[in-house]
């Protein structure tokens, strides 16, 4: 097991290994819907890809909340969305594009498919299954099992835009500060940034990557080591630590991570991002955190010193 998590620098050149090819392959057949489920981060990335390719009429966003997973309502909500899709003209089938959250929570996707009222095939992908599954090969097998097409989904209808997740807004906000922005994630969540517009091309962000075994064994210590090493090379004043859906669902010990980093001389300001909330919510919380952050040498408002004094005088 690694002593430090894999740390990757955000790049606008592309997300996961198969992220660009799998949706395109599904949309080649005009009667198939791609139903994207998971946190806002997961669904937003696929929404942007559908918009770029002119395939929004073949895209079904199914974002779920942390409460949906925690209360066991995810399968129920997904089944309801697919039953709605079954009533749309021209829909011959659905590829349910499952996320890490469904894998982690063991959502009963087979039951969802049975209740949909139309042919549904499940594609598992993402960092938690990449070690053991070949998504490209599985997709080809899945596509071969659909009945022959009898029509196409008409153009003209499109879902409402999927909002960017909280950490997207916070990462953008931190670009103007002397911060080392770090996203704690299993690895696939930056697709919602990668597939955006040109404004994200120079985004300064580093993020972790874990597989299923590393997450199962506990990865807080590895995260601390990875962040500490990255921060040491960054030359920045503090680490802006953000989270995403999988660390949130796992109940990762952010407090312990923050304390361990502080012991190693890394100033950390944690932003309570989950990937489930929207960017405006994340920015609102971030501004509140920045406005009240107390450093040892004094009180800072929006990262600027209000006055210079000793901590004992406050």
Residues covered by each model-derived region:
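An N-terminal assembly and electron-transfer interface module characteristic of large anaerobic redox
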Residues: 1-314
